[in-house]
């Protein structure tokens, strides 16, 4: 199994835009490991690091059990910026990214296509959440 560090390649900020905080699991860990870029997040999401956990999460039928599993087993980011600690008052630098999270939306592909086709809305990164529901 690969490590998060193997999936998160250092990329110059000027080349790939804003950076934001990356946190190791569990969700109650509020201390960031490092700042990463959208490219790093893409490499993490499309890599194998969380593949096993994602498959397990998607096989859990009970929402409460799935939410508890997700909280314990997934690393996470704060797309809004870099933080000293995950707390609104601890923002170091904002990204100016708008993060939209749509869960349990019927015909999600239609909305994906609309966002991607809209010339007024620049999509930097779009992905399906680990639950497969958003």
Residue ranges of predicted features:
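DNA replication initiation on ssDNA origins
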Residues: 1-96
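Short, flexible loop/turn elements at secondary-structure junctions
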Residues: 81-83, 99-106, 130
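Short, charge-rich binding segments
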Residues: 89-91, 117-118, 127-128
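Short, well-ordered loop/turn elements at secondary-structure boundaries
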Residues: 93-95, 119-122, 132-133
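Histidine-centered divalent-metal-coordination microenvironment in nucleic-acid enzymes
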Residues: 100, 123-134
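Short amphipathic alpha-helix segments
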Residues: 105-123
């Amino acid at each position: 199994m690969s490590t998060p560090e193997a999936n998160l390649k250092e990329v110059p900020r000027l080349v790939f835009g804003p950076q934001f905080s990356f946190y190791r699991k569990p969700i109650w860990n509020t201390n960031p490991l490092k700042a990463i870029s959208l490219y790093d997040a893409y490499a993490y999401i499309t890599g194998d690091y969380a593949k096993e956990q994602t498959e397990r999460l998607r096989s859990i039928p009970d929402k409460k059990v799935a939410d508890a599993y997700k909280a314990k087993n997934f690393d996470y980011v704060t797309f809004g910026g870099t933080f000293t600690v995950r707390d609104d008052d601890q923002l170091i630098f904002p990204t100016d990214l708008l993060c939209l999270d749509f869960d349990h939306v019927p015909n999600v592909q239609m909305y994906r296509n609309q966002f991607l086709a809209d010339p007024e809305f620049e999509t930097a990164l779009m992905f399906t959440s680990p639950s497969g529901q958003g």
